[in-house]
């Protein structure tokens, strides 16, 4: 937790989390509990001897693919609707405790379907947790369904068939559509037709881009997939013209500075382009990505960013205001969160004096 003088301010800020993989909130303790409940045999690997050993291994990822190996192994314990509800609700409790007022969460149906767990099971559990969180915790939640880019494109079309058949793009179940997984070998253009089908429903579109691939992947995502948001966007800092375009179009980057360090996409947090984004007027939010695997939930990420960059109250106001304004909740909800933010800014305005 950060020790700066703005610590109380960061705690008080109403937050929106827009880059959060719900499967990435699976803490080792819950992993072991669900494995036992569901009779799932974990790998014969010393790191699976205890929650502490597994967590220690999570602290030594060497790449995105190294992380994904453990990420997909971890989710193998999620079997029933109640498992998904428990997973999500535990995250919502943690998030609400860190003053997250609105969360837009990713989930990966294809990874579960491949294990024999139906899309309907997954989404039912997440929707149940969403409704509980909104009723009991006062946090609003939207679901972003994601395709896995490392799988054959026809499998993504098959998932879209299911989503269209269920009517979930139109009945409020799903608010966004995104794409995740290994990036470099799977350029955005491969999925142009998949995204075009979803675009016809009016659903918000996003994709992971520029995490481990060059800026051209971000540009291609904007041009071919017609996304209104970029998840990560780290590589945008390498292209001044792209930064100008992102700023001019108010394209939000759901930035995850700590996970970029955890996966060795950045040598250290000080190398994150936080200042570059601020100076260019690029809208970005600060997010935790897969906090159970990277060891930092959103409050801790805020604090690490603050300790590294010594941002002003004005800087944080820019970050949070842009994130709220470009969120996918209702206009009424945006106004509520912005009002809360203005009250916090007024209380802590002397910090910039």
UniProtKB/Swiss-Prot annotation:
InterPro entries xrefs: A/AMP_deam_AS (IPR006650), A_deaminase_dom (IPR001365), ADE (IPR028892), Ado/ade_deaminase (IPR006330), Metal_Hydrolase (IPR032466)
Predominant location category: cytoplasm
MF GO annotations: adenine deaminase activity; zinc ion binding
A Pfam match: A_deaminase
GO CC field: cytosol; nucleus
Chemical reaction(s) catalysed: adenine + H2O + H(+) = hypoxanthine + NH4(+)
CDD domains for this protein: ADA
Entry's cofactor comment: Binds 1 zinc ion per subunit.
EC category name: hydrolase
Enzyme Commission number(s) of this protein: 3.5.4.2
Positions of the record's site feature: Important for catalytic activity: 232
Binding sites annotated in the UniProt record for substrate: 290
Keywords assigned by UniProt, alphabetized: Cytoplasm, Hydrolase, Metal-binding, Nucleotide metabolism, Nucleus, Zinc
GO BP annotations, alphabetical order: adenine catabolic process; hypoxanthine salvage; nucleotide metabolic process; purine ribonucleoside monophosphate biosynthetic process
Function noted in UniProt: Catalyzes the hydrolytic deamination of adenine to hypoxanthine. Plays an important role in the purine salvage pathway and in nitrogen catabolism.
Protein name, entry field: Adenine deaminase
């Amino acid at each position: 937790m950060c020790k700066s003088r703005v610590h109380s301010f960061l705690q008080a800020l109403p937050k929106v989390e827009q880059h959060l993989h719900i499967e990435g909130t699976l803490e080792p303790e819950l992993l072991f509990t669900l494995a036992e409940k569901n009779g799932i045999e974990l790998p014969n690997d010393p790191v699976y001897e205890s929650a502490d050993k597994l967590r220690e291994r999570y602290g030594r990822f060497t790449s995105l693919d190294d992380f994904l190996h453990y990420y997909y192994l971890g989710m193998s314990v999620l079997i029933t609707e109640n498992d998904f509800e428990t997973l999500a609700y535990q995250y919502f409790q943690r998030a609400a405790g860190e003053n997250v007022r609105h969360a837009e969460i990713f989930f990966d149906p294809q990874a579960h379907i491949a294990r024999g767990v139906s899309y309907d099971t997954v989404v039912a559990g997440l929707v149940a947790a969403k409704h509980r969180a909104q009723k009991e915790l006062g946090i609003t939640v939207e679901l972003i369904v994601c395709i896995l880019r490392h799988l054959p494109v026809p499998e993504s079309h098959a998932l879209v068939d299911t989503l269209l058949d269920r009517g979930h793009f139109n009945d409020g179940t799903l608010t966004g559509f995104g794409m995740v997984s290994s990036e470099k070998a799977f350029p955005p253009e491969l999925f142009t037709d998949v995204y075009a089908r979803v675009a016809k429903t009016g659903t918000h579109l996003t994709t992971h881009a520029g995490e481990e691939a060059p800026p051209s992947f971000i540009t291609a995502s904007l041009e071919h997939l017609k996304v209104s948001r970029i998840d990560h966007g780290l590589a945008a800092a390498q292209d001044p013209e792209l930064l100008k375009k992102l700023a001019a179009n108010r394209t939000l980057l759901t930035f995850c500075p700590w996970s970029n360090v955890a996966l060795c996409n950045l040598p250290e947090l000080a190398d994150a382009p936080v200042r570059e984004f601020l100076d260019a007027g690029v809208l970005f939010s600060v997010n935790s990505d897969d906090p159970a695997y990277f060891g930092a939930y959103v409050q801790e990420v805020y604090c690490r960013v603050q300790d590294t960059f010594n941002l002003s109250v004005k800087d944080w106001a820019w970050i949070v205001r842009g994130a709220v304004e470009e969120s996918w909740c209702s206009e009424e909800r945006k106004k509520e969160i912005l009002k809360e933010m203005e009250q916090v800014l007024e209380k802590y305005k002397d910090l910039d004096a």
